[in-house]
Swiss-Prot record:
GO BP, sorted A to Z: translation
Subunit structure: Part of the 50S ribosomal subunit.
Stated name of the protein: Large ribosomal subunit protein uL24
Species, as recorded: Desulfovibrio desulfuricans (strain ATCC 27774 / DSM 6949 / MB)
InterPro entries for this protein: KOW (IPR005824), Rib_uL2_dom2 (IPR014722), Ribosomal_uL24 (IPR003256), Ribosomal_uL24_CS (IPR005825), Ribosomal_uL24_KOW (IPR041988), Translation_prot_SH3-like_sf (IPR008991)
Keywords: Ribonucleoprotein, Ribosomal protein, RNA-binding, rRNA-binding
Cellular component annotations (GO), alphabetically ordered: ribonucleoprotein complex; ribosome
Signal sequence bounds: none
Biological function: One of two assembly initiator proteins, it binds directly to the 5'-end of the 23S rRNA, where it nucleates assembly of the 50S subunit. One of the proteins that surrounds the polypeptide exit tunnel on the outside of the subunit.
Molecular function GO terms recorded: rRNA binding; structural constituent of ribosome
Highest taxon of the lineage: Bacteria
Amino acid sequence: MKMYRIRKDDKVMVIAGKDAGKIGKVLKILRKKDRVLVEKTNMVKRHMRPNPYAQQPGGIVEKEMPIHVSNVMVVCSACGKATRVGYKTIESEGKEKKVRFCKKCNEVME
């Protein structure tokens, strides 16, 4: 399984594409397709047929579409900048724990 430096509920900035510069929260990670679903970005309109069995009205619906994971960067909660993420081990109570940290300000991101 692939390891991503982005996790669900992370605050990320889109760095490429039509929504470049927008900041949003990661709603879902699609590991098989290397994509993430970011809140309020890459919005598209879909024409939905009414479905009376599911009580779904028809019409034009706006929804988010996935963005490739290489086109987003994590926004650090400490410095507020889009940054790369690194990993380091921290020893606490005799146990070593692997944590993510901001490469710009070296603050732990958890």
